[in-house]
């Protein structure tokens, strides 16, 4: 069983996201440890990028703060090397194709394998272009995780059939951020996914409260939260890891019911 599969093996998964380097890499490391200790099943790590097109203002701000504080792809790799000494849950990078290309795709993926990264999410990579990365991901044992936005049944089925790791279901069209309510018919999307793959699926974009997380994991196999965690970093700065740990515990308790 892959490391990512284990995250979903014993019940519903809670998946937090954090932008590496906001406000600094030391705080990111402490936050990763706090999330893992408080029940996170898998953590998405954002590699900062100057033009994060899928992100709303909260995560865009985190990217800019991280870059201004000196975060680089190499420094993020070093951070993962350090936390991997004692964090065993799956870690997945979420970044943009340009970050991987500019680093050198093979060099990027071989480093991911070396430091213990289990998967890669590239929100700006269209399904039709995934073969630019898929062979290298397979070569280095890194799952290329696909995103499914509200779209036609045929397209959902096509993406689901080739799913690796887990499927990231986008709760609504648009950018990331917290929402008061999610109106997309997610149950219909999940139904098509499950008819076409045994790969687990998690819902992200717009989840911030325990009630929303419980509702989403009533439909899918996991809930993904980013903006709400970034807001804690914005509010508490270097003191945020303790707050993040408490938040993750509340969210994990909610998804496990």
Regions found by a protein language model. Name each.
Residues 16, 35, 46, 112, ...:
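Conserved, mostly hydrophobic/aromatic
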Residues 47, 60-122, 255:
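Active-site beta->alpha loop and helix N-cap motifs at the rims of alpha/beta catalytic domains
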Residues 40-50, 117-121, 126, 171-177, ...:
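Glycine-rich phosphate-binding active-site loops on the catalytic face of alpha/beta enzymes
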Residues 1-7, 50-59, 71-81, 101-107, ...:
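Active-site-adjacent beta->alpha loops and helix N-cap segments on the catalytic face
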Residues 76, 191-199, 208-257:
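Alpha/beta catalytic cores of nucleotide-metabolism and tRNA/nucleoside-modifying enzymes
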Residues 1-18, 80-85, 256:
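N-terminal amphipathic alpha-helix/helix-capping segment at the start of soluble metabolic enzymes
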Residues 25-35, 151-161, 203, 207-223:
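Catalytic cores of alpha/beta
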């Amino acid at each position: 069983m892959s490391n990512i599969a284990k995250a979903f093996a014993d019940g519903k998964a809670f998946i937090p996201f954090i932008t590496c380097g906001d406000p600094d890499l030391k705080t990111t490391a402490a936050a990763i440890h706090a999330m893992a200790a408080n029940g996170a099943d898998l953590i998405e790590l954002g590699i900062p990028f100057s033009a994060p097109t899928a992100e709303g203002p909260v995560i865009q701000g985190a990217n800019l703060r991280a870059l201004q504080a000196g975060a680089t792809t190499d420094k993020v790799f070093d951070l993962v090397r350090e936390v991997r000494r004692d964090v065993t849950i799956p870690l997945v990078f979420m970044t943009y194709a340009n970050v991987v290309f500019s680093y050198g795709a093979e060099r990027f993926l071989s480093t991911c394998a070396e430091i213990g990264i289990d998967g890669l999410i590239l929100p700006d990579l269209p399904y039709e272009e995934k073969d630019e990365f898929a062979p290298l991901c397979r070569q280095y044992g890194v799952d290329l995780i696909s995103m499914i936005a509200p779209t036609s049944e045929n397209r959902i089925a096509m993406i689901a059939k080739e799913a690796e790791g887990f499927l990231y279901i986008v709760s609504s069209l648009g950018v990331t951020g917290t929402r008061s309510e999610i109106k997309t018919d997610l149950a219909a999307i999940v139904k098509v996914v499950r008819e076409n793959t045994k790969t687990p699926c998690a819902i992200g974009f717009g989840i911030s409260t325990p009630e929303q997380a419980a509702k989403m994991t009533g439909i899918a196999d996991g809930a993904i939260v980013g903006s709400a965690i970034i807001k804690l970093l914005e509010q508490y700065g270097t003191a945020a890891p303790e707050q993040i740990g408490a938040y993750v515990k509340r969210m994990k308790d909610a998804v496990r019911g």
